[in-house]
């Protein structure tokens, strides 16, 4: 074989390997996306079971304004449900108390200090 032929074969092989790598990466990304969608659907289903409609509505409004707080409260509620600590559905008043507790626990305290010269 001549050098140009070898170079052509090498390039062809490299292109084929790159194509396979890209396909496998795309497949992994798609699988991760599907897995996240399934997990999110399971979270929503669990929250539907443990929250009253009014509480779900309030949590949705909180999610619009403060997504991190809503996520923390959802995690807390799901943890309570999974450990069997919830005996009945959480109503709006109970959710308000939980929101306040989690908000107070995660609130950052800011202090402004002035340095005098």
From Swiss-Prot:
Identify the Pfam families for this entry.
Answer: dsDNA_bind
Q: Which GO terms describe its molecular function?
A: DNA binding
Q: Which UniProt keywords apply?
A: DNA-binding
Recorded hits in InterPro entries, A to Z, give:
DNA_bind_arc, PDCD5-like, PDCD5-like_sf
Q: Name one GO cellular component term.
A: cytosol
Q: Transmembrane ranges?
A: none
Q: Does the keyword DNA-binding apply?
A: yes
Query: Which HAMAP family does the protein's record reference?
Result: dsDNA_bind
The UniProt entry's sequence similarity note says: Belongs to the PDCD5 family.
Q: Which NCBIfam families match?
A: PRK04239.1
Annotated protein name in UniProt: DNA-binding protein MK1619
